[in-house]
A protein has these predicted regions:
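Left-handed beta-helix
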Residues: 68, 74, 79-80, 85-86, ...
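Terminal amphipathic alpha-helical/low-complexity segments used for targeting or macromolecular assembly
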Residues: 1-68, 178-183
Length: 183
């Protein structure tokens, strides 16, 4: 359950408590989604033993996702310290996301290509920021501390510390998120 505290700490901007978890769950639609995602993964073994347990949870989760405008696949693998900066228009498929990732609104992260032709989903590194309106698709890797700018369309690997601008996604520098997370 410490992973939930690491998420709420990102929302709060300092060390989070269970009181903060309650506060953000009640007041922040985007935190509500990541909180329920975490609960599902913590309680999966319990939910799967209860007849219709997973079904009831899944219905509630989908309801909360619709309310917030965030479609987050329960099959995604997300590291600790995750934060939706804003909510609305966010689609995250079955992808891998590292620690301390920030995602802004209207972002799409997911599968591209055809199954038979080697399509796939992205892997996002640690300390990555993905700006508003960005699209990151395909079997690609976004390196640690990369910054994907607003409205960028990314379909190829991005090295660590790269800053990617809008269409087409071009590397603008190699300073990434340096200073963004206080390091």
């Amino acid at each position: 359950m410490n992973i939930i505290l690491s998420d709420v700490s990102r929302y709060k901007g300092s060390k989070g408590t269970w009181k903060d978890v309650f506060k953000y769950y009640v007041t922040n639609p985007s935190f509500r989604v990541i909180f329920l995602y975490r609960l599902y993964h913590q309680w999966y073994h319990i939910l799967s033993k209860i007849p219709i347990g997973k079904d009831i949870f899944s219905l509630y989760y989908k309801h909360i996702c619709r309310q917030s405008g965030i479609q987050l696949s329960l099959d995604a693998e997300i590291g600790e310290g995750f934060k939706f900066e804003h909510f609305g228009g966010i689609v995250i498929g079955s992808i891998k996301i590292g620690k301390n990732c920030n995602i802004f609104h209207n972002v799409t992260l997911g599968y591209a290509g055809r199954w038979q032709n080697g399509g796939g989903s992205p892997t996002i590194g640690d300390n990555v920021v993905i700006g508003a309106g960005a699209v990151v698709v395909g079997r690609i890797t976004i390196g640690d501390s990369a910054f994907i700018g607003a409205n960028a369309y990314v379909y190829q690997d991005i090295p660590e510390n790269a800053v990617v601008g809008a269409m087409p996604g071009k590397i603008l520098s190699y300073h990434g998120t340096k200073g963004y997370f206080g390091h």
